[in-house]
UniProtKB/Swiss-Prot annotation:
Residue ranges occupied by any GAF domain in the UniProt entry: 218-401
Record text on subunit structure and interactions: Homodimer.
Gene: PHYA
Biased composition regions of type Low complexity, renumbered to the chain: 1-19
PANTHER family assigned to the protein according to its UniProt record, in alphabetical order: OS08G0260000 PROTEIN, PHYTOCHROME 1
Residues involved in phytochromobilin binding: 323
Organism in which the protein naturally occurs: Lathyrus sativus (White vetchling)
Lineage: Eukaryota, Viridiplantae, Streptophyta, Embryophyta, Tracheophyta
Domain Histidine kinase: start-end pairs: 901-1120
Family statement: Belongs to the phytochrome family.
Protein name as annotated: Phytochrome type A
Post-translational modification: Contains one covalently linked phytochromobilin chromophore.
Length: 1124
């Protein structure tokens, strides 16, 4: 099927097309920049965008020189903004290799008006930077030179030697040198003395807390909250959330502005408004500030001996380019602050627990943009806080995107339902004449069916004449494809596209036959876009030549008036599925009559119910509770204890008999009553809290030891209708560790006696000082992580010790890093922190999962001097006992098992149906046709039977009713063989049927459908295990045994012999129930063996030199004797 827009059917091809689109868009950006520079004040923005809008993602304009010059200009600009100054140093010598023209004045000039000779040292190429700053400042900069992740130290507070003025030194490394941005510390600021993350968090703490408290499920609410918090945090006149769409154009999706400013909410911008090169820079530098777009830029002078031009891409002072400055001026914006929102690329796989695998690929989802009508400077600590806030925001955006994908999956299931419903109709007319119809399949404005030279129209469509013209055009120019999808008929080359543009411009069309076509139509994108901003007053006009948001919006509308919303991959999958159904139906609707109502019912409403399952779960829960070596208790819906295992009875001194029947709240300490009450109420509502700490009373001889401290996970117990009928609490006894921690946190002097104590009761402990440096790492941490104390001490805890790249203990992803930072910072500010789940990779690559507790460290005066972190590892006993929490999830797991089984089993009969249909097309013999139709019918019956198998446990445990009927082995063989013929033909494997004729024609009595299911399954496994060009041989033997006067018992044995190395050992182990059922083959073989056992049979697998055999045995009855 041809398409004028690349679909993303695979990750690799999707990414390659995405790269091609970015390259093409970068070329367009370069042309725009070059034209702007050449045209000056005569540049007509709207006209240029309309012309460039026709460039598609799969077309690359040949402008390599222009593009190269543009990218070099963007990346190698030699100017900075004047609010600070810049030095570039040689890493080995600390000498200046480049400096901004304002650096000598800012860094060496004394404060009095008339400087005298000797007031300040000379600053230029070759100057040793240590002569410019005070000794402590020079020492700090010297230390940074040898630091691998130098950005973790930002900002470094330095003081000039001559004037004593404080500056923030913001350092980053480029090839061959260190670049340092110096930003003056304003008189009203309290200088930041610690590295960024720890101190900046305090500024954004309120905003982060509010974002984390939001309920999921609304991207709009999330974005509105973000812009509100940034508005309050930074004080800019306008804050917007800006989202990039799939075609790279942007949209303002949230906004807050001071009164009197024109709103931009709802505006869409062409992709060129934020060039690809700028987006790349946003991925590298997450925050970008322009203080005054009217300020004169400062040149950067570099040593002529340098073999390359320095890049200032990573500089916080980098000057904006003229094109962007003009844009800001046209929208009356003098200053701006932009934060990048970077999320996981949806094309990538999920996070891996493997330490050697790379991190997830990222993409720029959008920007948080702040504008001000007057110059505005935001100090680095506040910008760092904004970057931290943007990272938290990005995590929540990621979660909302994942939620949207889940909704998308539900839509796919809905589509399956529609497809199956349409399949039951009078195809193909039922898809337009009944409800639901083809317009319900995918989002569209209209649809049409062109069938046997007649047209049926639905919704907004072209005229009948125009549709016939489209069909004729497709037959002439798209003869080799099965259809066409495009978001622009104009771009696709349809001659009459302009006459259609007011009604439709996007189309998806598929052929049922060479002459019959189904169409879906979409109107242009502009019809769906609404601007939420102020309307024009009468007589007011825009100057479309200027680069302005309103002009951008109009230019965007001009571009998209001939383009619809692109067709999504899942929508095209649904369309293709319907196409296949209709094409098959058009061949012979009487032959292929799939029972899709059963498919729909089973796939979309699959439930595993039954008293046997409930009894199994109940007995398992009772066994686990009674024998677990960790404390476990359970209550009913009223909070009355109905479960109390031996371990908790030992800890509390309260026997099981006395505990049963008491209310849980009477058994816990008064200080824990509210905590337990909340936990219990939430669990009864289905919300299961994890890692909750409370204390429970002791009784009898245990009273003298005090209350027991527990870490508890709640697990709601449910009945078959998913109603909560009680709560089970799985706990870990942490009394000993808590005693140690309490003593630890109460000590006012020397902590080392406890931290460095080798006692096994001491948990893993590490700590940081108030500046973020790792200052504690006890013996338990060494054992747990594999990193020695001297290897981590005096490293930055956030980034060097625990981080996502080049760190000692690698965290799984950026989200884990940000959340770890939040917990540390909360404790540093004196706030109480709860235990949180924490995980990292040890030195050997093992992933460690634990609970993290963080406590502030205080000195004798009560000042916070750092934090201590305690890790609690789940004991093996707790890990074993946590199995009980997964009991409530068994239904979902069994559904997955059933779906895996069904997926496997459905393939065989469907393949048989397809094969039978192909055979029917090539024969005129009435007898053979009847045989093929009969085979197809048997396959369909088998399919229906499999779809009824929702209770796998019933089959495994032998609780399945067999449907007895008369049949011949010949019928079973023919039907089973039809299901594997496609596979055998593909591999060139010959199937030899050595079953004797008298056995094949023997009238038998039993469940023929189950027998053919089993036989087809073992045949397919044998074919898959046979080398290409090999042979599979079927043979049989039959013996009869008389039971009474009228019944003969038939012992049927079938052998399936194949060449090659044989069936994999793992699959055979699963067949015999020796291993967990993991693979499709293993599940299928296991079920087939259980079906044979239901028929008083079994299976053996024999291996000889060069060949192997399945030996199937089954007990049946001789049908002719039963008749008499």
């Amino acid at each position: 099927m041809s398409t004028t827009r690349p679909s993303q059917s695979s990750n690799n091809s999707g990414r390659s097309r995405n790269s091609a689109r970015i390259i093409a868009q970068t070329t367009v950006d370069a042309k725009l920049h070059a034209t702007f520079e050449e045209s000056g004040s005569s540049f007509d923005y709207s006209s240029w965008v309309r012309v460039s809008g026709s460039v598609d993602g799969d077309q690359q304009p040949r402008s390599n020189k222009v593009t190269t010059a543009y990218l070099n200009h963007i990346q190698r600009g030699k100017q900075i903004q004047p609010f600070g100054c810049l030095l570039a140093l040689d890493e080995k010598t600390c000498k200046v290799v480049a400096y901004s023209e304002n650096a000598p004045e800012m860094l060496t000039m004394v404060s009095h008006a008339v400087p005298s000779v000797g007031d300040h040292p000379a600053l230029g190429i070759g100057t040793d930077i240590r002569t410019v700053f005070t000794a402590p400042s020079a020492s700090a900069l010297q230390k940074a030179l040898g630091f691998a992740e130098v950005s973790l130290l930002n900002p470094i507070l330095v003081h000039c030697k001559t004037s004593g003025k404080p500056f923030y030194a913001i350092i980053h490394r480029v090839t061959g040198s260190l670049i340092i941005d110096f930003e003056p510390v304003k008189p009203y600021e309290v200088p930041m003395t610690a590295a960024g993350a720890l101190q900046s968090y305090k500024l954004a703490a309120k905003a982060i807390t509010r974002l984390q408290s939001l309920a999921s499920g609304s991207m709009e609410r999330l974005c509105d909250t973000m812009v509100q918090e940034v508005f309050e945090l930074t004080g800019y006149d306008r804050v917007m959330a800006y989202k990039f769409h799939e075609d790279d154009h942007g949209e303002v999706i949230a906004e807050i502005a001071k009164p009197g400013l024109e709103p931009y909410l709802g505006l869409h911008y062409p992709a060129t408004d934020i060039p690809q090169a700028a987006r790349f820079l946003f991925m590298k530098n997450k925050v970008r500030m322009i203080v005054d777009c009217n300020a004169k830029h400062v040149k950067v002078l570099q040593d002529e001996k340098l073999p390359f031009d320095l890049t200032l891409c990573g500089s916080t002072l980098r000057a904006p380019h003229s094109c962007h400055l003009q844009y800001m001026a046209n929208m009356d914006s003098i200053a701006s602050l932009v934060m990048a929102v970077v999320v996981n690329d949806s094309d990538e796989d999920g996070d891996s627990a493997d330490a050697v695998l790379p991190q997830k690929k990222k993409r720029l989802w959008g920007l948080v943009v702040c504008h001000n009508t007057t110059p505005r400077f935001v100090p680095f600590p506040l910008r760092y806080a904004c970057e931290f806030l943007a990272q938290v925001f990005a995590i929540h955006v990621n979660k909302e995107i994942e939620l949207e994908y889940q909704i998308l999956e539900k839509n796919i299931l809905r589509t399956q339902t529609l497809l199956c419903d349409m399949l039951m109709r009078d195809a193909p007319l039922g898809i337009v004449s009944q409800s639901p119809n083809i317009m319900d399949l995918v989002k569209c404005d209209g649809a049409a069916l062109f069938y046997r030279n007649k047209l049926w129209l639905l919704g907004a469509t072209p005229t009948e004449y125009q549709i016939r013209e489209i069909a004729l055009w497709m037959s002439e120019y798209h003869t080799d494809s099965t259809g066409l999808s495009t978001d622009s008929l104009l771009d696709a080359g349809f001659p009459g596209a302009l006459s259609l543009s007011d009604t439709v411009c996007g189309m998806a069309a598929v052929r049922i036959t060479s002459k019959d076509i189904v169409f879906w139509f979409r109107s242009h994108t502009a019809a769906e876009i609404r601007w939420g901003g102020a309307k024009h007053e009468p007589g007011e006009q825009d100057d479309g030549r200027k680069m302005h948001p309103r002009s951008s919006f109009k230019a965007f509308l001009e571009v998209v008036k001939a383009r619809s919303v692109p067709w999504k991959d899942f929508e095209m999958d649904a369309i293709h599925s319907l196409q296949l159904i209709l094409r098959n139906a058009s061949k012979d609707t009487d032959i292929i009559d799939l029972n899709t109502k059963a498919i729909n019912t089973r796939l979309n409403d699959l439930k595993i119910e039954g008293m046997q399952e409930l009894e199994a779960v109940t007995s398992e829960m009772v066994r686990l509770i009674e024998t677990a070596t960790v404390p476990i208790l359970a209550v009913d819906v009223d909070g009355t204890v109905n479960g109390w295992n031996i371990k908790i009875a030992e800890l509390t001194g309260l026997p099981v008999g006395e505990a049963i029947g008491k209310h849980l709240l009477t058994l816990v300490e008064d200080s824990s009553t509210d905590i337990v009450k909340k936990m219990l109420n939430l669990a009864l509502q289905g919300e299961e809290e994890k890692n909750v700490q409370f204390e429970i009373k002791t009784h009898g001889d245990q009273v003298e030891f005090g209350p027991i401290s527990l870490i508890v996970n709640a697990c709601a117990s449910r009945d078959l209708r998913e109603n909560v009928v009680g709560v089970c609490f799985v706990a870990q006894d942490i009394t000993a560790q808590k005693t140690v921690m309490d003593k630890f946190t109460r000590i006012e002097g020397d902590y080392k006696a406890i931290v460095q104590n080798p006692n096994q009761l001491i948990p893993p402990i590490f700590g940081t000082d108030e500046f973020g440096w790792c200052c504690e790492w006890n013996a338990a941490m060494i054992k747990l992580t594999g990193w020695k104390r001297e290897e981590v001490m005096d490293k930055m805890l956030l980034g060097e010790v625990f981080g996502t790249q080049m760190s000692c203990c690698r965290l799984k992803n950026q989200e884990a890093f940000v959340n770890f930072g939040i917990v540390l910072n909360k404790a540093m500010t004196g706030l109480e922190t709860e235990k949180v789940a924490f995980g990292f990779f040890s030195r050997k690559g093992k992933y460690v999962e634990c609970l993290l507790s963080v406590s502030k460290k205080i000195d004798a005066e009560g000042l916070v001097t750092g934090v201590f972190c305690f890790l609690q590892l789940a004991s093996p006993e707790l890990q074993q006992a946590l199995h009980i929490q997964r009991l409530s999830e068994q239904t979902a797991l069994k559904r997955l098992k059933v779906l895996t089984y069904m997926k496997r089993q459905i393939r065989n009969p469907l393949a048989g149906i397809v094969f039978s249909s192909k055979m029917l097309e090539g024969t005129d013999l009435e007898t053979e046709q009847k045989q093929i139709v009969n085979t197809s019918s048997q396959c369909q019956r088998q399919l229906s039977k499999i779809l009824d198998d929702s209770d796998l446990d019933g089959i495994i445990d032998g609780y399945l009713d067999l449907e007895m009927a008369e049949f011949t082995l010949h019928e079973v063989l023919v039907t089973s063989l039809s299901q594997v013929m496609n596979r055998s033909n593909t591999k060139g494997i010959r199937i030899a049927n050595d079953v004797a004729e008298h056995i094949a024609k023997e009238s038998l009595y039993g469940d023929s459908l189950r027998l053919q299911q089993v036989l087809a399954d073992f045949l397919l496994i044998s074919i898959n295990s046979t080398p290409n060009g090999g042979q599979v041989v079927i043979a049989s033997s039959l013996t009869k045994e008389q039971l009474g006067k009228s019944v003969h018992l038939v012992n049927l044995e079938l052998s399936i012999t194949h060449g090659g190395s044989g069936v994999p050992e793992a699959a055979l182990n699963q067949m015999f129930g020796n291993n967990v059922l993991e693979s499709e083959e293993g599940i299928s073989l296991h079920i087939s063996r259980k079906l044979l056992k239901l028929m008083n049979g079994d299976v053996r697998y024999l291996k000889e030199a060069g060949k192997s055999s399945f030996i199937l045995s089954v007990e049946l009855a001789a049908a002719h004797k039963l008749k008499g």
